[in-house]
């Protein structure tokens, strides 16, 4: 099952920012005094254009994580479970068993419409996009 925790995304974003900052300071030491953090990097400077192209994927991923955070709001920093929409039905089944709504000794001959149940639970979740995949999370 493809599941993410937004705390992982926050850590990933910080690691990407640090990687970019380290490379920037290594390649452009004359900016060191005015560049204390990733946010201080002058991406608009002409002399760093070709260097910036090497980090296109990383910058895009940082932007995607920022978008996920903006969509989920303040809950992002506390850890929101994001479930790939393709795994949603399986996730709901496990969730309902784990929290006790479906007893462990539930008779196998009783059929549950998991698709309809998953759709009913989905009402409390919102969809976000990360790395080209759609995820559902409570925000």
Question: Which positions does each model-derived feature cover?
Answer:
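Acidic interaction surfaces
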Residues: 1-139
């Amino acid at each position: 099952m493809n599941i993410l925790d937004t705390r992982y995304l926050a850590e990933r974003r910080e690691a990407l920012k640090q990687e970019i900052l380290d490379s920037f300071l290594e390649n452009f030491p004359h900016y060191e005094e005015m560049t204390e953090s990733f946010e201080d990097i002058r991406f608009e400077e002409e002399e760093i254009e070709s260097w910036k192209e090497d980090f296109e994927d990383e910058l895009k991923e940082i932007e995607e994580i920022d978008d996920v955070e903006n969509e989920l709001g303040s809950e992002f920093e506390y850890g929101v479970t994001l479930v790939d929409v393709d795994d949603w039905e399986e996730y709901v089944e496990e969730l309902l068993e784990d929290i006790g709504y479906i007893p462990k000794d539930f008779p196998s001959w009783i059929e549950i419409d998991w698709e309809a149940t998953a759709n009913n639970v989905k009402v409390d979740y919102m969809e976000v996009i990360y790395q080209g995949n759609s995820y559902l999370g409570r925000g």
